[in-house]
Structures are given as structure tokens and as C-alpha cells.
């Protein structure tokens, strides 16, 4: 098992490239939160920001100033290692792209990353895998979409059981399954 965050790991004929940062959200824990781009508007927050440390928590007195000093999602994505062959690349990007129905929060509100959308359009990988907005497939009815030639998957999480996507990269066929949990 390897930590894929910010790395490129070959697996047979494929290259997996990981990205674990997400566009800022209104919740307190900010370990992996970033502004999407320079134009990003910070959402109304539920309490002050905190970072988790080995020995406890660190309060962030001014989250907006702190966040503006960090690289944006757009900048961090641009710094990822490039694949040898985009047609054999699988990006595992925690936050979903905007505009594909893979980013729909409770109440039907889209919260995806425009920077991720632009990155996928530019990088043109074979496949992207996403998470973060667990309820999205249940809210939007969409768990798989396309952005140009790229297949984008967000399996989500179902109250009915464990949600998995089984796929064949050679054939580019995928099946979403909800497995009952006893």
C-alpha cells in the first residue's frame, strides 16, 4: 500500500497520480482545504478553522488570511507529476470537478472544483476517480460522467450499504454496486 497524494505510481501499464486536497468547505477541520483559485470566495464558516497535529489541535485565528497564503487547488494540480502517457493515466483526485453532476451536496447544491474541471480538460487522462461529496450520486443520480475523452467516476456512499465501482481499464467498462452490510 502506498500513499498516492502528490505522487505518480506505476501499476502495470497504468500510472496512478494522486491528489488529496479539496476546495475549502464550511467545516472547521482544514488540513486538506485550499482555495480553488485566486477568484475563489470562501464559504461562510461554521466556527474557526483548526488543523490536526500529532499532539492535538491548532486553532487558526484568521482562516481567510491563512488560506490565501497557501497554494490554490489550481496551483497544486499544476504541480502534480505528469504521466508518461495521458491515455494510460488514472488521476485519483479527492474533490470532484464542477459541472458534471459528481459534486452535488444535500439539497441539490453543486460544490465541485472549477480548477479540477480545467485541469482534467487540459491533462486529458484516461480516467479520474473522485470522492468527497459522499451523497452526490444519490442527490444527482450521476456517478459516472465524461469530460472530453476522460471518464470521471464518483462512487459516493449509500445508506443501503458499501458502495464500490468495479471496472476494467482495458475495456473502459465500469459498474457501480451497493453491497449490503450486515
Describe the function of each predicted region.
Residues 1-12, 16:
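Metallo-beta-lactamase
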Residues 2-6, 90-94, 120-136, 153-157:
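Active-site neighborhood of phospho(di)ester-bond hydrolases with catalytic His/Asp-centered motifs
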Residues 9-10, 22-25, 135:
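A short acidic, glycine/proline-enriched capping/turn motif at secondary-structure boundaries
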Residues 12-13, 85-87, 124:
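Short glycine/proline-enriched coil/turn segments at helix->beta-strand junctions
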Residues 10-12, 114-122, 136-182:
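Binuclear metal-dependent phosphoesterase catalytic core
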Residues 1, 27-28, 102-104, 137-147:
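Metal-dependent catalytic neighborhoods of phosphoester/phosphodiester hydrolases
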Residues 106-115:
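Charged helix-capping and loop-helix junction motifs
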Residues 17-106:
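Active-site-proximal loop/helix segment associated with metal-binding centers of metalloenzymes
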